[in-house]
Amino acid sequence: MKSIFLVFFAVCLVKAEAGKGRKREPNIINPPCRECYVQDSSGNCVYDKWGCGGARKREPNIINPPCRECYVQDSSGNCVYDKWGCGGARKREPNIINPPCRECYVQDSSGNCVYDKWGCGGARKREPNIINPPCRECYVQDSSGNCVYHKWGCGGARK
């Protein structure tokens, strides 16, 4: 029994030593598609009903984009790795909020934030004091009245 254990232990040590010299590759998921999706020949994520239970289950709502965490869908529909969304060294600017108006405001056709009384209770409530500028947190109103992202007001590194 001891000899079997010693042989097993020796084999494990040899395998461990052999694996030490290998170069570690980053954790790139290939394909980068979510569960129930596979990557086709052109790199797009397509739904794989057989990988998700086939005819026994209904096809779930299609996830758009169907990319896994840490991936974003580019303009051609491919899932590409987004290192900043996955703990990259620099902090990314947040996704731009569109429209960037505060609660009770909507963006008109020219991009200005205007008060929407119906979105805030309509005739039942008084119109609150107008917030000037009516932009959300991290946004400021420029000279033409549009809300633009202000990275310094959102924790950006100061000079």
Curated annotation (Swiss-Prot):
UniProt keyword terms in alphabetical order: Cleavage on pair of basic residues, Disulfide bond, Nematocyst, Secreted, Signal
Disulfide bonds: 33-45, 36-52, 67-79, 70-86, 101-113, 104-120, 135-147, 138-154
Broad class of the protein's primary localization: secreted
Residue positions assigned to the propeptide: 19-26, 59-60, 93-94, 127-128
Signal peptide: 1-18
Intracellular or extracellular location(s): Secreted; Nematocyst
Cellular component terms per the entry's GO annotation: extracellular region; nematocyst
Described purpose of this protein according to its UniProt entry: Inhibits ion channels.
Entry's family note: Belongs to the sea anemone BBH family.
Protein's UniProt name: U-actitoxin-Avd13a/b
The organism of origin for this protein: Anemonia viridis
